[in-house]
């Protein structure tokens, strides 16, 4: 069947549409609120720029940018079937910050791995300046790859989601490479950290509890990463691997992409929630100011408060 005869606009039952509207509204409100508070704490309430603080500040910025672009992306998906400037700009910001978020989570996992697995070399391998350089490099790589993806997309039928009559192989390859490589790194680093922590002898009950909490946090971070992003990229992998010759098949995968894409957006809220548990200094800084004169003690979550 000719692809031009297929309806590119997804139609959902009224109840599903209402659920999506409520879901998107809650996601926007909670995500903007949580990440704005997190960014305020990182910028104004913390006393020292650690590696953790630099990575998480960039992560909060990426999540906020994605959330701000989300209403325009949803509008263009529903009401526009061509590559308008608004569509290209909003979806470009959306995609850039999705994969920037993935890249930053990967950088945090590597930083944590270095701190725990190679503590003697951590001082020369880790520093706030190096963390800032990594963030700048990641922004440049992500934005550059998005520009290349945009040019390839325009050559192959369209950059915007709604204008693509088929899934462009080269542009999808950017998405798959931008996830599966970070996934392998995050899984490796997380397993290494958990292994080291499980073998580390505890000096007392307090340290044993701290080790257990740190291990749980590593597993939780890995679970959030996999649950939010893996379903979307599995659907992309299947879609690019199959020859979708019928409108029904394309419609099915378009619905799967829509649902898994919304699932991936929840990462913006979950990232903000993880801030409160990953960094003890974030918990201290987010408390109301007191009259205590005790000096601030910086805690780096990447060492998981165990070194």
UniProtKB/Swiss-Prot annotation:
Q: Does this entry carry the keyword Membrane? A: yes
Entry's Pfam families? 7tm_1 (PF00001)
Supply one GO CC term from the record: plasma membrane
| Chief subcellular location | membrane
Q: Name one GO molecular function term.
A: G protein-coupled receptor activity
Q: Which Gene3D superfamilies match?
A: Rhodopsin 7-helix transmembrane proteins
Identification of the protein by name? G-protein coupled receptor 35
Positions bearing carbohydrate: 2, 7
State the taxonomy lineage: Eukaryota, Metazoa, Chordata, Craniata, Vertebrata
